[in-house]
Amino acid sequence: MGLQSKLTVYAAIVGCLALMGGIVYYASLDNVSLEQVEVELANVALREAGEDEAKFVVTFLVKNPSEKTYVVPVIAYQLYANDVLLGSGKYSTEDVALPGRAQIFGGGEVPLKNTFILNKSEVGSEIYQLMINNEITNFVAEGMIITQSTWSVAETEFRSEK
């Protein structure tokens, strides 16, 4: 192979690497916008209660103060009532394709609902009865939210009280 051919191959490899570096750099420009997400625990409401298990609807109000449009594939959280850990929950749309998820436009906010299952055996009868009788009004959710745009993904920790 002649010198001219080797230079052409090397130039093509360098060009491909430069193109890949440019794509990675362009994708990282969204990270700052994605990390500006705000999560507010909007509501915890009883949906149904049984003898040993109760289901609650946990509503998060997700706000987008940036100009970028993004989606939320995951909110993983721990729910506390009166400083007692009730358990962990997870809102997830990971199995839904990106275009099918709820889009949060720049400056917008979207309520996202999740079913939280409370087991009597994990929290004790006293807390369980207070929860199903709607006698607890102080809730705290803390965890991690994942935001995603076409080019980028960001994980942000949050804590919210209601």
Range-by-range predicted roles:
Residues 48, 60-66:
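Asparagine-centered strand-capping/turn motif at beta-strand->loop junctions
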Residues 117-162:
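Terminal connector regions
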